[in-house]
Curated annotation (Swiss-Prot):
Superkingdom assignment: Eukaryota
Subunit structure: Intermediate chain of the cytoplasmic dynein complex 2, a multisubunit complex, composed at least of eleven different proteins. The cytoplasmic dynein 2 complex consists of two catalytic heavy chains (HCs) and a number of non-catalytic subunits presented by intermediate chains (ICs), light intermediate chains (LICs) and light chains (LCs).
Chain positions of WD repeats: 637-677, 718-764, 850-890, 895-935
Residue numbers spanned by region Binding to the DYNLT2B-DYNLT1/DYNLT3 dimer: 416-495
Protein name: Cytoplasmic dynein 2 intermediate chain 1
Role: Acts as one of several non-catalytic accessory components of the cytoplasmic dynein 2 complex (dynein-2 complex), a motor protein complex that drives the movement of cargos along microtubules within cilia and flagella in concert with the intraflagellar transport (IFT) system. DYNC2I1 plays a major role in retrograde ciliary protein trafficking in cilia and flagella. Also requires to maintain a functional transition zone.
Positions where Phosphoserine occurs in the chain: S250
Ranges of biased composition (kind: Acidic residues): 318-338
Main location: other
Length: 999
């Protein structure tokens, strides 16, 4: 700088200008190329967004910048003659190795410089012409821009920011690649220099580079504070600039707009030139990548040559290595100056004394010059009111520090390296994330509902609060047509009348229109079947009363009945067997109904003297009611001799009989007497009933071929024992639909089971299929099963005595499937209807061996149903239990060896039974009183006893009676009422009997 010229802030070297001047003076084609590339890159980066958006800038500022650059070039040429000599020496040493390449690069550089100077001159001329042609347009545009600046600010800022950020990103990527490559070269050179120079202090520059790596670590902690102070100073600087711009607002709008137009025009032209140069530089850069290896080798030689030149000669090359770190320059004043002075002081202590002095003088001169320039520039701005144009809202904020004049430059290599690495790492992550975002894309084609909660209605809410858990109410509706409706109206007046058809009197109708509804007499409801039953019972009572009155009158045959009362009875009566059709007929059998105890049937043989041709050849059966002894209720006739008989198990309306010819006959006592034969005897008509159904002559394949020994009803558990005080005969409606079984046993051991069937309707003309059915009858027998008892009754010793003969059969009342059969060998067979295996199969007497003893009668106890009595022909009486083969008790000499012909339990006392033998004796047994023999016996003579049966009412224990119905050889039948001691049960007699049986 000339001593007489006043120095201002513009005279101070800027970082870009200083690097440019040093590299141009060095004369190296490589350095010139790098400088051009960096400048073109920087100009394109700063000018691209401004040119595209037509931002207004100050043209005078650009002109002043060019003048200052020329002055710096002149100042540099005068201030550094020594550096130029060093560079010329360096050029001469490298001239032999790079003649061809240097010539090419120099020619290219000169052409570019010439083109640049020529283009600048043309730009000025074009700018003047454009300024003259578009002056009016610019004025209108300036006025329009000033008016619409505030409205377009935000919109333009967003657009410019997007475009500028895109351009900066591209430029930074290219710059990062170049910086990474330069960093690698610098690090390689640093290692080589370190190996070459080591820690020698004779080479201060190499030693300073060696120490730089260690100092970077200490600078990291200071970088944060420096950046913070830098931001604070930047904010303060912006405030000062804003204040200065407010003072300089006195400039006319015309001048401001002209400057903006000139600035935009120049920057646009510069942007075009720099864009063309940057494109050419890119092509040259690609071509020089191939020569990179050769350049590295040449640089090593250059470093070896520079060892003799000293630190002053190495300075330009050092500047070249760090040319890309212009963004890391910081404005230093205040605390930064003190820090720089402290660091320079530490370095000066390590350098030689002469070099320390030289460095200190340079630093003092630079600091003094910067202070003076700052003061002068501030005074100048205050006097002239000159300020820079206010930056637009859309201008990039990073450009303001570069336009602000600086007073000093400090190169922070550690921070620059750290920032560069951070930028590269962030850029890589951003690039990777953008690529991944293109690959990873969410698919919105499917939509799933994670929770679908429909609204809750009132019914569901009620069930949730008051209903049972895990249950749901359901309802159905049927019979939809049955709809009821309620209406409100007046009562309907009604009247009831009655009539009778056919009329049986004068009053055949009732009711009157004159009478009110309340006066009408309500006719009571009449139950006709119930009335009929009542009348029937009443008639029976009346008949009994009349019978008693007749007995009291004392007929001829009554006094003798009282004289015939036995010792075992309190009173006696005699049935009227002196009827004309019963005279000279002996009684062969007596049977009492177990359901209706007052009903007894007597079987009469053929008469000894002829009486009536229609009756003399027929056997008679008379059904008696012991309460009406004057005459039989029904008189039945049979063609064959009757050997056994029984009543139906439920009600005594059916009578079954077995004949000597093997046939089974049935009488239905409910039939109308008009369908039977009537005979007039002694001025009285008697109805003689023929059998309703007979198996004689039909069903020959299953019918018996030998005389029947027994016939028994097969009782069931559903049958209930009843005592009928009233009439034993009911109407057909009451008995309709009944069905049960009857078993018939002959002496050969054939047991037939018959089903009693009641037809729904009687046919008066008879049946063509059922030949055994009487015309108008409704009861018939259907064969069910046949059981052959001969095989089960065979014994190994029975061959000596011939075939076994069966004499009697009884079914177990509690289980009609089981039955026992008495034989003529003293054995009692135990079998079932389904041929099941039973135990024991045979009940035997206490004596071992087989004896020709007939088991004439068997009777089950009505109280202890598993216990039965057996009377034998040898006079022995056995008490068997169904579960034991041998008898519980056996009495051998109770009848003095006379055969037992009849044996029955008392219907009122569990421990009492009566026995009849063939010697016309009656024995009364009371096991609780004496279990060794009978407690009473009654011989009957001279009219001997033929048959005996017991009648009574077990349900009426207090007022009950037990009577013996005795048939004598003379054909008379009398009723003996037993004494109360044998009819009234004792306390707990049933339980005492069980204890006795268990012993």
């Amino acid at each position: 700088m000339e001593p007489g010229k006043r120095r201002t802030k513009d005279d101070t070297w800027k970082a870009d200008d200083l690097r440019k001047h040093l590299k141009v003076q060095s004369g190296s084609p490589k350095e010139e190329k790098k400088l051009r590339e960096k400048k073109a890159h920087k100009d394109s980066e700063s000018a691209a967004p401004e040119y595209r958006e037509h931002k207004s800038r100050d043209p005078d500022r650009e002109a002043r910048h060019k003048e200052k650059t020329a002055e710096r070039d002149l100042y540099t040429s005068t201030e550094h003659p020594r550096g130029e000599r060093d560079r010329e020496r360096h050029k001469e040493r490298r001239k032999d190795a790079k003649d061809r390449e240097k010539d090419k690069l120099k020619e290219r550089h000169r052409d570019q410089e010439a083109e640049k100077a020529h283009s600048r001159g043309k730009d000025r001329e074009r700018e003047k012409d454009r300024r003259a042609r578009k002056e009016e347009i610019r004025q209108s545009m300036a006025y329009h821009d000033l008016l619409s600046r505030d409205m377009r600010g935000r919109q333009m800022a967003e657009k410019v920011e997007k475009k500028a950020s895109k351009i900066r990103t591209e430029e930074r990527e290219r710059r990062d690649e170049d910086s990474e490559r330069i960093d690698e070269d610098r690090e390689r050179r640093y290692r080589e220099r370190k190996l070459q120079y080591g820690d020698s202090k004779e080479h201060p520059l190499s030693y300073w580079l060696y120490k730089e790596d260690g100092e970077k670590k200490h600078r990291k902690a200071k970088d944060a504070d420096r950046e913070k102070r830098l931001r604070e100073k930047s904010s303060m600087r912006e405030k000062r600039e804003r204040h200065a711009r407010e003072k300089g607002s006195s400039l006319s709008d015309r001048e401001v707009e002209d400057r903006h137009r000139e600035k935009r025009h120049k920057e646009g032209l510069h942007y075009d030139d720099e864009r063309r140069r940057s494109h050419a530089d890119k092509k040259e850069r690609s071509s020089k990548e191939e020569h990179k290896k050769r350049e590295l080798k040449e640089l090593e030689k250059e470093d070896n040559d520079l060892e003799a030149t000293g630190p002053d000669e190495y300075l330009p090359n050092l500047e070249d290595d760090f040319v890309d770190y212009e963004d890391d320059f910081e404005v230093c004043d205040g605390d930064d100056d003190s820090n720089n002075e402290h660091e320079a002081r530490e370095k000066a202590e390590e350098l030689p004394l002469a070099q320390k002095r030289e460095i200190q003088e340079i630093q003092k001169a630079i600091s003094a010059e910067n202070e003076r320039v700052g003061e002068l520039s501030l005074k100048m701005f205050q006097k002239q009111g000159w300020t820079e144009y206010t930056k637009e809202p859309w201008t990039d904020a990073n450009d303001s520090p570069s336009r602000t004049p600086v007073c000093g430059i400090f190169v922070d290599f550690a921070t620059a390296s750290h920032r560069q690495k951070s930028r590269s790492q962030a850029l890589k992550q951003k690039t990777r994330s953008s690529k991944l975002l293109r690959l990873i894309d969410l698919d919105f084609s499917f939509t799933f509902s994670l929770l679908d909660l429909p609204p809750v209605n009132e019914y569901d809410m009620y069930i949730r609060n008051f209903g049972k858990k895990n249950t749901k109410q359901a309802y159905v509706q049927y019979n939809e047509d049955n709809v009821e409706r309620d209406i409100q109206t007046e009562d309907i007046e009604t009247r009831e009348v009655w009539t009778q058809h056919p009329g049986e009197g004068t009053a055949v109708s009732g009711g009157s229109e004159e009478k009110d509804f309340s006066d009408v007499t309500v006719v009571p409801k009449i139950d006709t079947p119930r009335l009929a039953n009542f009348l029937r019972a009443a008639c029976q009572v009346v008949a009994v009363l009349l019978e008693e009155d007749r007995l009291a009158a004392g007929p001829s045959w009554i006094p003798r009945a009282q004289d015939k009362a036995l010792n075992i009875s309190d009173s006696s009566s005699q049935l009227n067997t002196s009827l004309p059709f019963l005279q000279s007929r002996k009684v062969s059998c007596l049977h009492a109904s177990r359901v209706q105890r007052q009903t007894v049937v007597s079987v009469h043989d053929l008469p000894e003297k002829a009486f009536a041709p229609s009756l003399d050849s027929r056997h008679l059966l008379c059904v008696w009611d012991i309460w009406q002894p004057s005459g039989p209720q029904k008189v039945l006739i049979c063609e064959s001799k009757v050997t056994c008989c029984c009543f139906s198990p439920l009600k005594a309306f059916l009578l079954f009989a077995g004949t000597v010819h093997g046939s089974v006959v049935v009488w239905d006592l409910r039939e109308d007497s008009r369908i039977h034969h009537y005979v007039r005897l002694s001025n009285c008509f008697w109805a003689f009933r023929t059998p309703t159904f007979s198996t004689d002559g039909i069903l020959t394949s299953v019918n018996h071929r030998s005389p029947l020994q027994a016939i028994e009803p097969v009782a069931t558990s559903a049958y209930k024992k009843q005592s009928f005080v009233l009439s034993p005969f009911s109407t057909q409606e009451e008995m309709a639909g009944l069905s049960f079984h009857i078993a018939s046993l002959d002496e050969t051991g054939v047991l037939n089971v018959w089903v009693v069937v009641e037809l729904p309707k009687a046919d008066i003309s008879g049946s063509m299929s059922d030949l055994g059915l009487i015309p108008g009858g409704r009861i018939k027998l259907v064969h069910s099963t046949v059981i052959q008892l001969g095989n089960s009754l065979s014994h190994k010793d029975s061959e000596l005595w011939g075939s076994t003969q069966t004499l009697s059969v009884k079914f177990l009342p509690s289980d009609p499937n089981h039955f026992v059969v008495g034989t003529d060998m003293g054995l009692i067979s135990h079998s079932t209807r389904q041929d099941w295996r039973v135990s024991p199969r045979v009940f035997k007497p206490e004596q071992h061996g087989v004896r020709p003893i007939k088991v004439n009668v068997i009777d089950f106890s009505p109280f202890e149903e598993t216990v039965f009595l057996a009377g034998c022909s040898d006079g022995s009486i056995r008490l068997h239990q169904l579960t034991s083969e041998r008898p519980i008790m056996q009495w051998d000499n109770s009848t003095s060896g006379h055969a037992v012909t009849s044996l029955q339990w008392s219907p009122t006392r569990p421990a009492v039974f009566l026995v009849q033998d063939d010697a016309s004796r009656i024995y009364v047994w009371d096991l609780l009183e004496n279990d060794l023999g009978p407690v009473a016996q009654q011989p009957i003579s001279p009219d001997k006893l033929v048959a005996m049966t017991i009648v009574g009412e077990p349900e009426k224990t207090s007022g009950s009676f037990v009577a013996l119905v005795l048939a004598r050889t003379s054909g008379t039948v009398d009723v003996q009422n037993l004494k109360r001691r044998w009819t009234t049960p004792a306390v707990d007699e049933h339980s005492q009997l069980r204890l006795l049986l268990q012993k």
